[in-house]
Amino acid sequence: MFYNFLSPLASEWTFFNVFRYITFRSMAALMTALLISIILGPRFITWLRRLKCGQYIHEDVAAHACKAGTPTMGGLLMLFSLSVSLLLWADLTNIYIWQAFFVFAGFGAVGFWDDITKLRHHKNRGISGKAKMGGQLAVACVAMLLLFVNPDYSSKLTIPFFKEVTFDLGWFYLPFGVFVMVAASNAVNLTDGLDGLAIGPSIVACIVFSIFIYITGNARFAGYLLVPYMPGVGEVTIFCAALVGAGLGFLWFNAYPAQVFMGDVGSLSIGGVLGYLALLCKQELVLAVVGGLFVAETLSVIVQVGYFRWTGGKRFFRMAPLHHHFELKGVPESKIIIRFWITSILLGLMALSVLKLR
């Protein structure tokens, strides 16, 4: 809003020229979302308690019994903070801003439906797997179609760490893109099992993609770093910054011991939009690097289920996802969280190294 109303005044008052800079508006968007989350957080948590939106805890993890009743659906706070920040600082005529917001809100709506169902049934099982997958596929399909019909968008798959190595998937890029968004959404959802465990790596991934997206939208930087250039995409840097701010504000209350959980409304939306951001800046495979922690958590579940069926009842891990395995081995929750955060930061740095190793 500030960009649309104030930047035209720069021709008469040079001070307003600052609103044209993506870097300035990105920092402002981050701080706005962060402050909104921190200021409104206590009231929001109190409101959730009044509505009795308490989390139902997995019975197999005895150490989590004390967390029963902790308010959930904290992702709504992130959605509100993000929305206000975007309204103030983003260029509201930019189609990519609206597409990113659609993905975040769309996956969030599926998560909200799942969370509400859990609360109504008073157990830790929400909507059916088919219903959840159907909702995710619907949102991802719409988002991919919007990207695919864009003449500036390419169906080429970029291979990280290699100079100008691409594969044109053609129409197969559509289902591939849908898979990326849905897989990322569910991967973050699986990781959201300890206080602050999912939001920390999500913030790191969002920071990494904000850098890639800024470069993708800048013709000079994109040409120098051999990144596919897409005009207008740089504005999504503001979306990324606002999401980082909203995530940090949420982490203020979600850090161990958590006062609120993000719920599926938060985890599904964050994962889905991370997938979209990777597709938007043509760094689809880099998502597997910066989101390596999410990949490991997902693979642990796949291995556990496959091994259980193959051996007729034996388990490969003590419990899946992976963070529960470490819990049952006696590693303190706070130590697991910090170590996973450190791992995600290292993976983020590795992902950024793609820019120079090309």
Curated annotation (Swiss-Prot):
The chain crosses the membrane at residues 28-48, 70-90, 92-112, 133-153, 165-185, 196-216, 233-253, 260-280, 285-305, 335-355. The keyword tRNA processing does not apply. GO terms for biological process: cell division; cell wall organization; peptidoglycan biosynthetic process; regulation of cell shape. It comes from Desulfovibrio desulfuricans (strain ATCC 27774 / DSM 6949 / MB). InterPro entries: Glycosyl_transferase_4, PNAcMuramoyl-5peptid_Trfase, PNAcMuramoyl-5peptid_Trfase_CS. It is found in: Cell inner membrane. Its EC number is 2.7.8.13. CDD domains: GT_MraY. Its cofactor is Mg(2+). It is a multi-pass membrane protein. Disulfide bonds: none annotated. Pathway: Cell wall biogenesis; peptidoglycan biosynthesis. GO terms for molecular function: metal ion binding; phospho-N-acetylmuramoyl-pentapeptide-transferase activity; UDP-N-acetylmuramoyl-L-alanyl-D-glutamyl-meso-2,6-diaminopimelyl-D-alanyl-D-alanine:undecaprenyl-phosphate transferase activity. Belongs to the glycosyltransferase 4 family. MraY subfamily. One of its GO terms (cellular component) is plasma membrane. It catalyses: UDP-N-acetyl-alpha-D-muramoyl-L-alanyl-gamma-D-glutamyl-meso-2,6-diaminopimeloyl-D-alanyl-D-alanine + di-trans,octa-cis-undecaprenyl phosphate = di-trans,octa-cis-undecaprenyl diphospho-N-acetyl-alpha-D-muramoyl-L-alanyl-D-glutamyl-meso-2,6-diaminopimeloyl-D-alanyl-D-alanine + UMP. It holds the Pfam family Glycos_transf_4. This is Phospho-N-acetylmuramoyl-pentapeptide-transferase. It comes from the Bacteria. Keywords: Cell cycle, Cell division, Cell inner membrane, Cell membrane, Cell shape, Cell wall biogenesis/degradation, Magnesium, Membrane, Metal-binding, Peptidoglycan synthesis, Transferase, Transmembrane, Transmembrane helix.
